[in-house]
């Protein structure tokens, strides 16, 4: 028996390939994956035989979309910047050319969820922006309502403050840390 997400999967209402058959399951990927594994353990396996169960979660993979029940976790926390946050990578050419920098490479729409309904915020990468907006569109109405209630004020604040330079870099870091830790919280 096998049941896997397509690619890395989607956080909301993901498509699984269940023994070769694709099917979309409504809900949050971590909860669904865990429930499928527990169901197999309890109800579907041959209990007279040994088994190996490999359980791989979508979290903590990009784009770090938290479950709606975890959106407010860590709201009151400001995470300290790592000592090397503003590293210039002097003398380390390969490190200076990587594309995983919060400052340079973290996409405002795709990674940081600033997909506004007015379509005023744009990514530097049109493909990432399109995909970021598609991730939102996978949600059902209840998921969207919870998501919007949380993210819309953040989006409006982002638009109003027009952060640049260090202020923008540090804002990106806080957004990333909050979303990342909320997403992996679901695995605990």
Where are these regions (language model features)?
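Compositionally biased, low-hydrophobicity segments enriched in charged and small polar residues
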Residues: 37, 48-51
């Amino acid at each position: 028996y096998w049941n896997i997400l397509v690619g890395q999967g989607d956080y909301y209402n993901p498509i699984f390939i269940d023994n070769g058959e694709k099917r979309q399951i409504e809900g949050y990927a971590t909860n669904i994956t865990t429930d499928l594994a527990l169901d197999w353990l309890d109800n579907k396996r041959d209990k007279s035989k040994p088994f190996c169960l490999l359980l791989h979660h979508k979290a903590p993979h990009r784009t770090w979309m938290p479950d709606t029940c975890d959106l407010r976790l860590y709201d009151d926390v400001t995470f300290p910047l790592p000592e090397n946050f503003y590293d210039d990578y002097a003398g380390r050419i390969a490190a200076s050319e990587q594309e995983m920098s919060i400052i340079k490479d973290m996409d405002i729409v795709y990674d940081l969820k600033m997909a506004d309904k007015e379509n005023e915020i744009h990514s530097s990468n049109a493909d990432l922006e399109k995909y970021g907006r598609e991730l939102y569109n996978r949600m059902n109405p209840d998921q969207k309502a919870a998501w919007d209630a949380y993210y819309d004020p953040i989006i409006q604040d982002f638009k109003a403050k027009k952060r640049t330079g260090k202020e923008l870099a540090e804002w990106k870091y806080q957004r990333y840390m909050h979303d990342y830790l909320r997403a992996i919280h679901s695995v605990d």
